């Protein structure tokens, strides 16, 4: 038998029997001695084995290739060249040949991505390339790969008007960006620099220049740091695909710059119009997903927008909040979304206005402002009580006007006697009793049970949510400082089962202010401090941790949002690696001992003993939960453990004091089922017994529902994928039915699949549908009827555009629409709407955009603002503005639109040096705008607890100086990872540690932005 045949048979057997990479390397050494093979032939055999299997993704294959590279049997350049030869990237859409070839060639992009990522790791750790020839070969292979991917992109664009090129395939985007990062990594090595600096490699540099020139225009939509790194590489080594141009001449560049300045100076701004749609868009954006409410940032935006015209500001803000509620009703938004909008109107706005009034140096006629705002509302949407009986339509908002007026009266904005005048009829309720935060804190300290009652009232729409939230968060912080974990447990349990209450909390507090004390307590939990029973301690620890997990997964929070600055934090380790199982030989001696004790307690002994728990801290148990599941399930699948015994042992985890551990365990189990190549019957039976237990205690039911809320979305996606591969299975649907009610738990601002399908089937695709939305907003503002309902709008559409097609293309569409509306004499209105869309808060960039408003509270050395994982509309606009001198020469009208929009956005987003006629120091002192845990000023909510400088308010001018300095320093931001899944079935996942921070694709949540400066 020939060497290639023997190696082919060997590889086929290894894949079929799921031989791990360590054993594969040992077996390969033996076969190399018996049947030596050239590296080109070897990699061909490896990749052809994939074709024989016909599997879209096998995680073992790239691990085998990486193992052969580490053994020195394969070079990266050879691997990349062969990988391209066998890749499905060559398939062209819409051709008969491609269809015929599809039968012979399997989909390879997932494997291609992983192999290239392994090459990135080898380069970044210094293991490759080992010679100048290998380096040159690697450069050539990367250039060929880039040309192939760009060609595929253009083929997709040409094949269908609805195709989005790269953006039509997350795998293609990941592959594209991986190639760029690999190129940057190789060019940063010593041998890479030698190759690029050598005059004897002109042919290579020309080819590489062609590839870079094709790559960079597409890269700008994906990763600005990567684009900047490769752009610098191109300029440094003159990689333009041709001999370097002759001296351009400094004078011509200077002339271009001067012409750009003169062009901008020639543009005269029109009147700044504050359209009704502008604030309508901004409020929608604040509440589209996680409530993005920062009082200082909002007040700054409103002050920039309205100046000293506070009566107009208040009137328009009230109108916008009612418009948002009206839109939600007509769009049939969920009751959860409708509740948040109502709570913002009734609970947030009155307290916000009260803060403004307390600091105002001028009289603001609140009753008149409210009257004018209410007169602009559609009476059919907000009917009076008497009209309800004659109306046939939806009366869900019939009592909102009354609730808002009573809340305003409760905050002393208007006298109670004016409610009847403003309503036009007798009110049907009495004025609610107003709360004081300090009184509520005293009540909870005296009677801890009062906290439960108040948490229930957070969801009331009586205007009292602000003081309640302030009291609850202050008490929680004090309890954390005092380590009074029993009372804290009860508060955390009460909050965990009320997701809507968490939404209201974020109207008044940032996530960091709520969660930083909890995470610090969990991280510093010393097991030897408590000498009592272990079960209550597990109970308290689990309840506190569960609330942190609820916040994290409901709102997709980053480590920065959670207030975690220590890389060795237990909470951070749990989120990043908790759902990844470990091999036994990777565990420490104490971990092996704890694991054995828990396995014995669950499956051998009569139950969990005090000795088992007292020997293992809660932190250690949670970090071992996935490994415990992995080992137990493996024993059952191997026939060493009866399923009923397995099921009985897992039922112990349904006890309240251990239930929160199912968050990490179910995440691991879902990944295991999704990855399984063998029959997943046993894991599915285990999963069904855990998500739908035959019996569970009353106390545990609420915790179990919370656990399902957290894990349902990922489990649902994984199980549906498994069902697609095994359509005949009948044991998946019952699990999906149990999970279905929990799928609406996340609140991240992501759109629904049905919404995306509607937008993408628009004649102009997603960008066309966004332009159509902008047109409807302009049309609404030009209507002479002030009572006309707002047009249908959800900010999820704009967020989807940024995440899917990228901010650069989306901004281009907005600029095109702005020019069109300008030609139709609606330019000033359209400019305000476009600027509002650009300024609207976005979850990914909220941390960096809000940080300048709290410079005193931010210690960038200890707690740096994270990097933003994507290019925002503001970033894209800034890049367009930099290019105005060149754009003005080719397309003056477009350059003018860029300049006007840039100016309007800059005016709306600029930190104000002083709010006219508002004494901000008085505002802070009277309205208790204390700097909280992370410095997010929240009106009406003093930040309590350690670290707050009571009575030591910062000077406003100093704050603004610091903010300007921070802005000049160019602070970046980003978003943290979720709980890391073991996506390779317990195999070597070292590459994931490098790539967890890498944003490998727009719209692909598996990867985040790579710190380019740190890597290169």
From Swiss-Prot:
Belongs to the Mediator complex subunit 5 family. It comes from Aspergillus terreus (strain NIH 2624 / FGSC A1156). GO terms for cellular component: mediator complex. PANTHER family: MEDIATOR OF RNA POLYMERASE II TRANSCRIPTION SUBUNIT 5. It comes from the Eukaryota. Component of the Mediator complex. Transmembrane segments: none annotated. This is Mediator of RNA polymerase II transcription subunit 5.
